Amino acid sequence: MLGLKPIKLLPARERVASALRKAIISKSIPEGAELTLENTAQELGVSVTPVREAFQILARDGLLEVKQNKCAIVLGVTEKTIREHYQLRAALEGTACMLCCQNNADLSKIKNCVDTAEEALSHQQTGNYTDYNQSFHFEIWEASGNEKMRNLLSELWNGLSIGVEMSELDYALNSQSEHKKIYAALEARDAMASRAEMEKHILRSMDDALTYYL
């Protein structure tokens, strides 16, 4: 036994928003597509309530236009939209890392995420890496102690940003390597280094997402 703890997941509305945001950014759901509450809920295996809440989150992001008849229309996504999204995430998550260091936060849950992912990837098991990745970021937001920042970052979450020419395993290994650098800086209580490593990590994800548009 490795003594690892369960991975924590985001609330349902953020998971739904993440799945939809990723599909819209990667163009799996095209501009102009109509999404209904019932069909989206059925496809994602959730109730209608978190889908309705996710529609509102994505409407605030400018990705959906919510209609009165329980549906939403996918709006166009541009390079500018993607850059602004990731630049905001980089700024907020970099600050979250700094707060972890400045507050001398307990890093045990963050370490658990790194160790669990490392064990899985050592056997080339990538099936659950989406959850490991999500939990790593979530635990940093939690450890920052800033509840408003955590809530905003939860709504901004969009999961893995795998580029068009990258395999799932290569992406996971690259992401995990970056996570280990972030954790090492957090463990050293180096606020500036942890912020820099996190910003680099998020902006690399931005570059991967932009491969669908450039």
Where are these regions (language model features)?
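Short linear motifs at protein or domain termini
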Residues: M1-Q102, L210-L214
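Short helix-capping and inter-helix turn/linker motifs at the boundaries of alpha-helical repeat units
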Residues: P11, L107-S108, D170-N174
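Mobile beta-alpha loop/short-helix "lid" or hinge segments that flank ligand
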Residues: R60, L64-E65, N158, A172-L173
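Short, flexible turn/loop "capping" segments at secondary-structure junctions
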Residues: E65-K67, N133, N174-Q176
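Conserved amphipathic alpha-helical segments that form helical-bundle/coiled-coil interaction surfaces
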Residues: H85, Q102-E165, S177-A184, A193-L203
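Short amphipathic alpha-helical interaction/hinge segments
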Residues: L160-E168, M206-Y213
